[in-house]
Amino acid sequence: MPSTFPYPPGFIRQYDPTQDSDVVLQLIMESFKLKDDPEGMHTLQRMREVAQQQRENIWLSPATTNMPGLVWEIDGKVVGNINIISFFDKLRHIALIANVAVSPEHQGQGIATALTKHALRYLKSKRAYQVWLQVSSDNVIAKNLYKKLGFEVVRTINNWVLKKGIWQKPTGNYDLSNYRFGIRKFADWGWQKEQLLQAYPTDTRWYGNVEFNKFSPWAILNILSWDEYSSLRHFTLKEQGVIKGVLSWQYGLPRADALWMALEKTTAENEHAYALIAEFLEHYWKNGSIRLEYPFGRAEGALESLGFTLSRQLDWMKLH
């Protein structure tokens, strides 16, 4: 039976992939203005594929046995949505609340609040170890709502994109004559790993689906890592023999190659980032799209000068 609330109008019920998937995807696209966002549209396409699989396999996992999401319905029309995505880290249940969307004509009625509260009650009953969500940094209304429900901002992440095409190295930005760029050596891994863990903390790395132990030069000894190892390359930037940065390049990914940058947080970080990525783009890049995730406030000037654009800025919020 659906749970009813006196306010707002309508009622909440469990998402049913056999009837809700198309309208929910349309709702998400409109609410988050994804039509002109290639990354967002790719995510929607993945959601369509998952919805299709759910429809085909509904007899294996009927809607009554799991809870991928909730919808809000008014007069037979779905006007709100929330998804619950589960991850497991060392057997601990970590939940991500995602795609909280309400149709424009029904915003401000408390639907998003009701959906989020219901999702939190559900996750509490499932004894989720941690509950997280991502929200656009400039979405003040949503952030205030989540703060009232017990969420706190843990960190802010910039998602950068370099579009495919011909790239020309900017001139006059920095004097790079003292830097040496080359293939990463075995001895560089310890330094790289330390800086990666600083830039990409473990408490949110589960979402990025990246395992830095596979960046290790010793990963080749693990037969299970061979596929990923063969699509990774690593480069080191040094100044007078001292490591200043390491760049890892994941290529052959579905929508865009990925870069993972290991740098010390110093006053020279912009210069080191510029030197590291400029050399990579000039000598190794194959003109395809690139995405790079990096902490807010770090290396922003370098990335902008190299032609990267800020795709989105997201706050990671955690329930406390």
Segments from the language model and where they lie:
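Conserved GNAT acetyl-CoA-binding A-motif
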Residues: 123-136, 284-295
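Conserved catalytic-core motifs of GNAT/GCN5-like acyltransferases
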Residues: 134-135, 152-166, 309-319
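Conserved beta-strand in the GNAT
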Residues: 67-71, 77-86, 96, 101, ...
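Active-site rim helix/loop that mediates acceptor-substrate recognition in acyltransferases
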Residues: 28-74, 78-79, 83, 206-232
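Conserved acetyl-CoA-binding loop-helix of GNAT-fold acetyltransferases
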Residues: 99-102, 108-121, 125, 130, ...
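Amide-forming acyltransferase catalytic core, primarily the GNAT-like/NAT-type
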Residues: 13, 51-53, 58, 152-254
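Conserved active-site alpha-helix within GNAT-family acetyltransferase domains
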Residues: 113, 137-155, 295-312
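A short, internal acetyl-CoA/4′-phosphopantetheine-binding micro-motif in the GNAT/acyltransferase core
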Residues: 71-73, 85, 98-107, 259-273
